[in-house]
Amino acid sequence: MKRTHLASFSNRDKTQEEEGEDGNGDNRVIMNHYKNYEAGLIPWPPKNYTCSFCRREFRSAQALGGHMNVHRRDRAKLRQIPSWLFEPHHHTPIANPNPNFSSSSSSSTTTAHLEPSLTNQRSKTTPFPSARFDLLDSTTSYGGLMMDREKNKSNVCSREIKKSAIDACHSVRCEISRGDLMNKKDDQVMGLELGMSLRNPNQVLDLELRLGYL
């Protein structure tokens, strides 16, 4: 009994010594890590900063701050947009022109049939940019045609004025030439008459005698 008791005590002492050695070893390892950490040999453990909006992780607080500023700007822009754009559109029921039409058939018409008609009405009332550009092109082409017509009219008027002026000058020249011819004919007739009177001196004497007789 004494031997077994002594053996148990010896075993306990050995286990305590081993545990003490293990504890001292762990303490030594911790002290070595702490010394290396103070000396700067062990870096800081990496820390991730998560965004509260999109749960994106960043390695530095500065990067997270810049990312949060972007989210704040987006929220400020959304606040400036009017709220009625985000509300669902409530379509008013279209009045039935036929009074004999039953209410059951009108209730069976769904919004799926109403929406295409509304889109068609909007497409009719509000022209698209392509239609606007077509209108601009048509107006510009019409304006160009009108300008060309005005130019052609002015050219025709100028031609007619020139033609009338040329005709007037030609008629004046013709009248002048006719007057010259008539004057020449009168001069020739007078010359002939004078010549005839000079050629017949008897007639002249006869006139003088008659005057004396009277």
UniProtKB/Swiss-Prot annotation:
Q: Which cysteines are joined by disulfide bonds?
A: none
The segments annotated as C2H2-type zinc fingers are 49-71
Compositionally biased tracts (Low complexity) = 102-111
Keywords associated with the record: Developmental protein, Growth regulation, Metal-binding, Nucleus, Transcription, Transcription regulation, Zinc, Zinc-finger
- GO CC terms on record? nucleus
InterPro entries the UniProt entry points to? Plant_dev_regulator, Znf_C2H2_sf, Znf_C2H2_type
Q: Which GO terms describe its molecular function?
A: DNA-binding transcription factor activity; zinc ion binding
SMART domains cross-referenced by the UniProt entry: ZnF_C2H2
Indicate which residues form the motif Nuclear localization signal.
Answer: 72-79
Q: Does the keyword Nucleus apply?
A: yes
Locate the region Disordered. Answer: 1-27, 89-130
Compositionally skewed regions (Polar residues) per UniProt: 117-128
Among the GO biological process terms of this entry, one is: regulation of DNA-templated transcription
Tell me the tissue specificity. Answer: Expressed in roots, stems, axillary buds and flowers.
**Compartments, record wording:** Nucleus
Another remark in the UniProt entry says: Plants over-expressing ZFP11 show are dwarf, have abnormal leaf morphology, flower early and most of the plants are sterile. The stunting phenotype is due to reduced cell size and cell numbers.
Functionally, this protein is described as follows: Probable transcription factor that may regulate cell division and growth.
Put simply, this protein is called Zinc finger protein 11
- Source species of the chain: Arabidopsis thaliana
